[in-house]
């Protein structure tokens, strides 16, 4: 299976609808989600993860950063910085924020993404 990234459909989700500066283009492929993200400078997922286990993202993400920089903080408190040109694996129990416009592609398990989206919609959907 293949598709030009520019042909991935816009994904409407809690995060793209409720967070300013978040654009998501994604498609479900088998048991994975292939998603291209554009995050504007200043995007911070931390307040939008309230209600998830430990108030952190429970989903693992594998990907590549095309442009920009993003920061990841894990449950144990350590932080990593992912820069343009880096491939990455971000395990469950993390938060993410960006200090500059950032674009990346990620691949994540569909069932875990669906559950995380459901929790966000249930706990934060009206905010």
Where is each model-derived feature located?
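Acidic/histidine-enriched, glycine/proline-rich intrinsically disordered or flexible terminal extensions
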Residues: 113-127
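Ligand-binding loop in jelly-roll beta-barrel domains
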Residues: 32, 92-117
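A short, N-terminal "cap"/entry segment at the start of jelly-roll beta-barrel domains
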Residues: 1-46, 52-54, 126-127
